[in-house]
Amino acid sequence: MHKIYHNSIAAEHKSEEHNMSKYKHIDDFIKIPQLNNKDQLFHYTSAAGIKGITGGEFWVTESRFLNDSTEFTIGTDICIEILEKHMRNSRRFLYAKDLLMEQMRKYYREEQEDTVSGSAEGSYVISFCTSGDSLLMWSEYSDFMGYCMEFKYGKLKETFQEHCGNDSTLFDGKVIYDHDEQTELLEDTIERLLLSDGEDYKTIHGWDDLDSAEEEDVKLFVDHISVICLLYNMFFKKECFAQEQEYRMVFLCVHKREHQVPENSIPVEYRIKDEVFIPFIRMKLGDISCLKFVCVGTKNISDLAVKGLRHYFGSRNLEVRVKKSEIPLRY
């Protein structure tokens, strides 16, 4: 799957900033918004998290072990809705749906480990926020007692890319929560990528042709759609999470290829949380100068919290400013 992702939008990291809008996009077809290099990005964490990150690494959790149980599935569900909307032949729709579901199961099964080929891959997610002093985020991630780290997006992404290696790929973008927007993005991408010229198919040149198209063409069409689903699945979430204002970085890593561990591959490790083994990777942060501010949680009222953090940064010669949350909570 890593190869499929990589080949589908290989020019992602070369996209240029657009001065006339807040966001650029992954590329001309995958319309996931991206920040511009001078923008800020925020990460809510604990004191231990700050120590680890400023020590030079993020612990990045495997996507299937995140808090949202529907991670990496929303794009697939919406794609099925789109197919159902355009296909009047119920038997042909069920055929296409079954093909898509099987293809997606195959992709994500191979992410764990393919026992035949001996390959293993994984998708790992760091969640950031576009809001730097969010009441919801303080509550959800630190019980109002943690810290919010402010990064320069461009520098942060650059240092991650420098440490990705040949067997990992970084994708990043703003999470999309609105169902109508998700549907429009996915439908538009399918139409522009797969239906604009129809050169790949003998009998499919538009949505109306799906009901009568040859099965071979339907299968090829669904195979192509599945790659689009893989990409959008990374950045689609349910609307109930919209207040998180998430911006995420997704690392696609090959841990093993045909029973061989690639040189410089990133190993999987495991931490224990609530008696559960959680797979993660250590992603190196070579240049900590991308960290500009740390905000102390709104209920962390001890003056020692600010003093201790400033003392810590000073001892490590880090030019990071410390400030208190402006949210006036008492208890």
Segment roles from a protein language model:
Residues 2-331:
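Partner-binding and oligomerization surfaces adjacent to conserved cores of proteins
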